[in-house]
Amino acid sequence: MLCLSLNSSSTSPPKLPLHHSFSRRGIRSWVRSPCVQRKKLGFWSSPKAVLSAVSGAGSEAGKVEEAEEYDAIVIGSGIGGLVAATQLAVKGARVLVLEKYVIPGGSSGFFQRDGFTFDVGSSVMFGFSDKGNLNLITQALEAVDCKLRTIPDPTTVHFHLPDNLSIRVHREYDMFISELVNYFPHEKEGIRRFYNECWKIFNSLNSLELKSLEEPMYLFGQFFRKPVECLTLAFYLPQNAGDIARKFIKDPQLLSFIDAECFIVSTVKALHTPMINASMVLCDRHFGGINYPVGGVGGIAKALANGLVNKGSKLLYKANVTKILLKDGKAVGVKLSNGREFFAKTVISNATRWDTFGKLLKVEDIPQEEKNFKKIYLKAPSFLSIHMGVKAFVLPPDTDCHHFILEDNWGRLELPYGSIFLSIPTVLDPSLAPEGHHIFHIFTTSSIENWEGLSHKEYEEKKELVADEIITRLEKKLFPGLKDSVVLKEVGTPKTHRRFLARDSGTYGPMPRKVPKGLLGMPFNTTAINGLYCVGDSCFPGQGVIAVAFSGVMCAHRVAADLGFEKKAPVLDAALLRLLGWLRTVA
């Protein structure tokens, strides 16, 4: 087993059985998480406890004892799981995080090849603002005395759409609205009214202290302090972005653009995207902005993991949880693939709901509520990812960092390989690639069914064929000479993401089977199994960096109340949970 040690005197680099070929320099940069202590905010400093991956049977300082009972065990170290774990650790809870892989972060992790540092998933980072209450990444890092340097992105995304519709979503809100109005002058009023509705929701959220919506004392407190804001959110909770947009906008092409905006948020069109989810993203990109962490997105998880250890909790790598242990109907621990068992007062699953209730629990232990969830939501498709190192000459001057490409047909938006999302983080942080080179992160929708039943040879050939088609499209649309500029290429399929991210079918997350009633059907953090909680994109409010961080904050608050680290009102708790359960049944 590999674990994070509190031994700050370790001098030898960890021996990691990586599937990526990390350089020694790369491993050392991972060990020294780029964390700035609050007392030394003017410069980079070494963290108080070095993140060292050591044998579980080795250093006593980092040894994880099976007989030891924790306040909480967290399955998985995605952003949602790490935020929940660190928030609990700060409150005084003893937390054990169990991670299947050898580095933290999940979809927000990283890997290195030949001098290139790649983000595993999205490079579009929200939550780093220094203002408001939705700067959840900043808050999570500050809670464990960490701060990351970031680089502001002047353009959230550059859309390249059918009929030569080319729209930049500028960081400055008025610039974005002006550009959109220039394309659709006849919809000027409708554009402003739709986005004003988004701001109404965002400003309400941003004014509230964000904690668990399953904790009645918090809810009552917020309602009495901010009744208008709370009622605003309650009003929009069952509504979808597409319905709101159609109240103000009639132009079919502009409505298709709103669909593309929402597709980036939720992998579905606006009519299926909850208005609250859409508003968080469509407004925070202008309020707090997109800010890229220096050194890559993986720095977020590294800093949170280091902060967790510094607060006295533990993180165990290569810890593949295969079973949640129940006693008298209560979650009391977990079992690993090697037979080791760990016990805690509560268990928090950062796995998807399909993994949690389809693999980690026996069929007879699955509550009816979770069976109902699967009737409302299905697994969104996975994606094909292409990580490339390219020569710098291929980028035109003033190329934006993020691009969304849908060349010729709006009807292809949701189809496999129909649209392409491209990030070039070296536009912001050149240190991620060798001099004279850039990084391309390319993502497009793909389903695991299209990759099953192939021989190894057929699988590899299909990867190359599909990747070549995607690269050809980018070359034709944006980057002439792209193919000749490629010096490194790694292609990931839904099977890759299922294996390394431990996500059932490699899914991006849940999506509604039919037009949803906003977020009413989305479960929160508690489950029908006593002592078991869920966190991440299978919980309210859904997918995205802000959303899963919000989920982590909410989960930590609810668990802390149940453990006695926060005030609670048992009678009100029971009534509220029954009400929330009933609301999900009418979704």
Swiss-Prot record:
EC number: 5.2.1.13
GO biological process, one term: carotenoid biosynthetic process
Protein source organism: Oncidium hybrid cultivar (Orchid)
Catalytic class of the enzyme: isomerase
Protein name in the entry: Prolycopene isomerase 2, chloroplastic
Listed InterPro entries: Amino_oxidase (IPR002937), CrtISO (IPR014101), CrtISO-like (IPR045892), FAD/NAD-bd_sf (IPR036188)
Protein's gene: CRTISO2
One Pfam family of this chain: Amino_oxidase
Entry keywords, A to Z: Carotenoid biosynthesis, Chloroplast, FAD, Flavoprotein, Isomerase, Membrane, NAD, NADP, Plastid, Transit peptide
